[in-house]
Amino acid sequence: MATLDHKILHYLYLGRARLAEAVLDLLGFWPVKIYLALLFILNAINWLLAYFVNRSVSQNLVVLHYNVNLGVNLIGPVADIYIIPTLGLIFIIINFLLLLNIRARSNFLIHLLLGFSLLVNLFLIAAIFSVYLINFR
């Protein structure tokens, strides 16, 4: 049993070393640094806007979705506003993990995935802003 534990720890140590090497290799490409800085700034803006909406609401329920044709589609608790920035963070993490697997193949894929994450976070900021407008204007 001791050898099995030793092997598992050895594989975990090697996996951690490979992961660190892959992250450092990916961060060596300067556009990745710029993309990640912009992504984390946009996601921080997302979280701040969600906090502002949460703090501004004086009741327990908030309109979370509005359709022009049908009107209000979704009403929920105020804490559900934090789903929006969480989705942005999930997109950033998933795309970064995908980049760790394809980092050596193509620079185009790096720009595509991180650009998509930027676009998603911009749309999520617009979504939080629209939730604010629906509830307070």
Language model features: what each stretch is:
Residues 1-30:
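N-terminal juxtamembrane cytosolic/stromal segments of multi-pass membrane proteins
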Residues 26-41, 110-117:
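Alpha-helical transmembrane segments and their helix-start/interface "positive-inside/aromatic belt" motifs
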Residues 35-49, 120-123:
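Hydrophobic alpha-helical membrane-insertion segments
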Residues 46, 89-104:
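Transmembrane alpha-helical segments in integral membrane proteins
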Residues 53-81:
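Active-site and channel-lining beta-strand-loop segments
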Residues 78-90:
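Hydrophobic alpha-helical transmembrane segments
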Residues 99-122:
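Cytoplasmic juxtamembrane regions at transmembrane-helix boundaries
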Residues 125-137:
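Juxtamembrane boundary at the C-terminal end of a transmembrane helix
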